[in-house]
Amino acid sequence: MPEGDSVLQLSNRLQFMAGREVTGCSVRVPRYATVHLDGMVCERVWPYGKHLFMQFDQTIVHTHLKMEGTWAIHYAGDRWRKPGHTARIVLQLANAPRDIEVVGHQLGFVEIYPADQYHQRIAHLGPDILDPDWDREEALRRLNNRPQRAIGAALLDQKVVAGIGNEYRAEACFLAGVHPATPVSEVDTARILDISRRIMWANRTSPVRVTTGVRLSLIHI
């Protein structure tokens, strides 16, 4: 499953959507099959943990890749690289000389709701570990809230901190010299949280993950 750095990079690739008008829309999820975004303008695209958000006027499209989801970008009319039956959202955006299509394939989660519900919808999530202004103290409080829980399970819990997945959990525990099954109460949670943040921050713009070596030595783990 993609982790927070992958979703951040995806969001960065989709920034071209901002300011473009939707010229065609198909939501292939039964609950939202009648939703039409045509004529709306994409206000912004952003990540939160492993979740991706797109705002069109006062409507938010909220998706999660889960295990197999992807977003494809191509010119309208071009042949898709994946089968049509895997598409969950098809967005056509204004562009000259040819419109652009953005297609979400095999998305594991799709919700569409009014923009004023955004904070309510993400209230269950912990602080986003890749937010430049992330709330470290709140994440630490949540991490310490269940002292008998295994540290590995706690780091994976998106209600504790949003964005960490299995690969970064394993690497953070390894770099901290801690077995993932160790109870939270027996771990220097501030240190392991800081390691998690640092290795993810170091990889936030890189297509190839590196968790040891020169790059990380520059951030003083």
Regions found by a protein language model. Give the residues of each.
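Structured catalytic/nucleic-acid-binding cores of DNA maintenance enzymes
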Residues: M1-I219
